[in-house]
Each structure stands twice: as structure tokens, then as C-alpha cells.
A protein has these predicted regions:
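Conserved hydrophobic beta-strands of the Rossmann-like cofactor-binding core
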Residues: 4-7, 82-83
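Conserved glycine-rich cofactor-binding loop
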Residues: 11-12
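N-terminal Rossmann-fold NAD(P) dinucleotide-binding loop
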Residues: 15-16
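Aromatic pocket-lining residues of Rossmann-like dinucleotide-binding sites
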Residues: 22
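Conserved glycine-rich Rossmann-like NAD(P)H-binding loop of the short-chain dehydrogenase/reductase
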Residues: 25-42
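A glycine-rich helix->loop->beta "capping" turn
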Residues: 50-53, 72-84
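The beta1-alpha1 cofactor-binding region of Rossmann-like NAD(H)/NADP(H)-dependent oxidoreductases
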Residues: 58-69
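Conserved NAD(P)H cofactor-binding loop of Rossmann-fold oxidoreductase domains
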Residues: 86-88
Length: 88
């Protein structure tokens, strides 16, 4: 069964590397960060390299309203793994 992984801070650094590793393992990814352009580039890279299905959710996790929005949006998702990597 394919796992779903949500990674915050996915646009660079450790978060990006987590995304690459889980994509290589065949997981579906939910990528969250502030920069949509970086997330879109990463999603395309992972799709080309591994056929990975990525969902992009842009948000500034330092903002309480955006955290609430994400939680509400993902409340119906089945998450197997959560990587809380967003930095401030």
C-alpha cells in the first residue's frame, strides 16, 4: 500500500531531501512551504524522476491562521508520515 507523507519546509534543505527520499520509496507527497515556485519545481523533479504524485500546499507556518487552514484542508486526508521540518 502506498504511503502518504506530509513534509513541511519541503522547498529546500532537509525537507527537500526528505521529499526526494520518500519519492524514491514510492510515496505520495504533500509538500508545504512558503515558496510555491520552489515547491512546483521540486514536484516536477520528483514526477520526472520517480512518477511521484505531489500535492502542493503553500503556507507560512509562522501564521496561526495558515496553520488552521492547512489542518482543516488536510483533515480528510489519511496521513501515514508527518515530517515537521518548517523553520522560522
Amino acid at each position: 500500500m502506498q504511503k502518504t507523507v506530509w513534509i513541511t519546509g519541503a522547498s529546500s534543505g532537509i525537507g527537500r531531501e526528505f521529499a526526494r527520499r520518500y519519492a524514491k520509496m514510492g510515496c505520495c507527497l504533500i509538500l508545504t512551504a512558503r515558496r510555491a515556485d520552489r515547491l512546483e519545481a521540486l514536484a516536477e523533479e520528483l514526477k520526472q524522476a520517480h512518477g511521484t504524485v505531489c500535492r502542493i500546499l503553500t503556507a507560512d507556518l509562522a501564521c496561526e491562521e495558515e496553520c488552521t487552514r492547512l489542518c482543516n484542508e488536510l483533515a480528510v486526508e489519511t496521513l501515514d508520515i508527518f515530517i515537521n521540518n518548517a523553520g522560522f
